[in-house]
Amino acid sequence: MKSWMAILLVMALIIFTLDNCYSTDDKPIGKCGDRQRNKLCLVCQDRSQIDYYYTECCIYDQTYYMCLDMLRH
């Protein structure tokens, strides 16, 4: 009986570990953990119609400042 419980415990641990490793949680890219920056980068991506603009805006400050300039004009 104890061996079955040990096997089940090990299987549960393996499944839990794999679930955390292959989780599909949408984590913010780069500096887009900040809500304001995230919203601005999304707006700039929509306006620019460039697929990778959001990622660039979240990672690079220069692209973020270009985004701010785009929204000012």
From Swiss-Prot:
Disulfide bonds join 32-58, 41-57, 44-67. Expressed by the venom gland. Belongs to the scoloptoxin family. It is found in: Secreted. This is Kappa-scoloptoxin(03)-Ssm1c. Inhibits voltage-gated potassium channels. It comes from the Eukaryota. Residues 1-23 form the signal peptide. Keywords: Disulfide bond, Ion channel impairing toxin, Neurotoxin, Potassium channel impairing toxin, Secreted, Signal, Toxin, Voltage-gated potassium channel impairing toxin. One of its GO terms (molecular function) is toxin activity. One of its GO terms (cellular component) is extracellular region.
